[in-house]
Amino acid sequence: SDYIDSSWSKPKVVNLGWKDERLNMGTINFSTDGRTMFFTGCYWPGSQGGCDLYFSKSAGSIWLEPTNIGNSINTSTWESQPIISSDSKKLFFASKRAGGKGGSDIWMSIKLKDNTWSPPVNLGDSINTSKDEMAPFLHADGNTLFFASKGHPGLGGYDLFVSRADALGRWSLAKNIGYPTNSLGNEINIFSSIDGKRSWISSDRAGGNGNYDIYEFDNYNEIM
């Protein structure tokens, strides 16, 4: 969907360029130049098992056959919701892999010189809890991380939180971004504009059209 004259156009199906008979794919994220697409594919042939992370390169108006991102990141459990940093050097994602704090955690991997990915690092106790953390979104500034959590104190269900990295890459204690962005329902997924002025979330709060809807709002101090 394109934003034209202060409104969104009717959604169009992405031209993937490959025959899509696979069971499930989603949580798409693009590199800054728009030429690499990262996404989740579940129970695909040749996968590590469960849901894995994949990437695809653009070729004009279509997308080339996807590539599994590899077993340095993917496991036999569940990896999902990739987000690439604006410089394409860091990949954040959610995973239920061994070695976490419990439930699904948020992890980070660094792109190496040979274009492979380093073994991922758990983002630690300031972000991950014994319950579920998921849906990471790294702002274009490279230091502001948003995510959904059931483990940190919240208003109900999943809430959205923000953490910021210092000069040494240490993440601050997660902060609930508050009402009215969070509600008594579930808020999962947030995207903020490059200029930091607007954000979009998905929520199943009361008053929507059913299940999860997308909401748009102007940012406030707790956001940026």
Question: Which residues does each predicted region cover?
Answer:
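Short, conserved micro-motifs composed of acidic
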Residues: 1-224
